[in-house]
Amino acid sequence: MRLFDKIVDKMVSEKVPRKRRRRLIIYIAVITLLSMTTATVAWFSVNTFAGVQNLDLHISMSAQLKVAMEDYGTDLEKYGKVITNEMIDEYLQKQNTRLADIVLDPVTTRAGDVFTNQRGAERVPNKRSYLEFECYFIATEEMWVHLTTESTKQGEDDGTKVTTTSTGAKADVVNCARVGFTTAENGTAIYEPNRGTPVNGQATFDLPGGAMVYTDNTRIFHIEQLKPTKVTIRLWIDGEDPQCDDDVQDAQLGVQLGFIGCDENNVPIS
């Protein structure tokens, strides 16, 4: 209302006739109301955000592919097959936060490395915007790393999937989530679960709903033999996605990522 007061004061000082002044004020009020009601199409209009419930990474036991939160060079004993919430929390401690405190305020991106909000302002990670952390993959032979929906070991259900415990319309949060994987060699690959029409010029991929089939589209990065490869992983809610509306506010998101190594013909390495 301060804006209207300033306008009125200015019109009074400039001796604008009272009748014309009333018309101008009503016109300005209508325009402002329209801008408020049409500003939000897909983006949240109220910032109560979505939260990250869990985020786990699992690697197939068959191929000699391992991962760690730090670069341990070629000391394979210090790498493992799993990255847990607790390990991600240790990384986030450097930024005075933890996974349980991460909230996903809608952002969008074209290439998966620079993120902006609805007003076009650039956002930084892990600050009520999007989640970002780094990890290092290493393999005993050259390979392409793929996402997989298959369980990484027998008897487990740890393949790639994005889930929610939220119900009703909030469950649509799984449709507007994105996960990006960035390396110096291969750039960024963006996984879009339940992929729809691409938004904001993004090049994304989805995984098959049935039996897993490995193709060039499921590749996320390449690894040289015994060369630690830094991978930046980002999780965000894309505000340009049609499902990213007020219905999914306060939803909880769970992300499980399964990785497998394949040869140049996309055949899993045993």
Model-derived segments and their meaning:
Residues V16-R18, A42, D157, V174, ...:
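Short, structured coil/loop segments at alpha-helix boundaries
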Residues V41-W43, G51, A68-Y72, Q93, ...:
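A composition-driven signal for long, intrinsically disordered, charge-rich low-complexity tracts
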Residues D9-R20, N85-V124, G187-P228, R234:
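Extracellular adhesion/glycan-binding regions together with long Ser/Thr-
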Residues A111-D158, G201-S270:
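C-terminal, structured domain-capping segment
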